[in-house]
Amino acid sequence: MNVGELSGAQLDCWVARAEGFRAEVVKANGIEYCRIDVETVGHQFYQPTQNPVITAPIQFRQRYTLYPLDEISSKGAGTLRVWIAEAQMNPEFHDMFRDEQPLVAMCRLRVAEAIASGVIKI
């Protein structure tokens, strides 16, 4: 599995597994989404790639740094902004991911860390 290519509901589910949830991708009305099973509560939507309320605690706990980078595109300098999510302050894991969406970059970093540490197996 190439973590850098994960997106959407698939990425959401891998983040959920990294966070210790039982998760699965389900399809309803032609839309795929990640559904987690929360003990004593039941099923819930889980979309860390779209919800900063979910990703902010992950960023703080895992000591991730998130910053923008303006790149040169075919339209000129500063017309393409990507976001870098980096585990530079984490003493046990060092890596970085980039994406046009900051939460996607951070979610990919969380999945990569969980795989490297053995929290989730692929």
Task: Identify the residue ranges that each predicted region occupies.
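Glycine-rich anion-binding surface patch
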Residues: 1-122
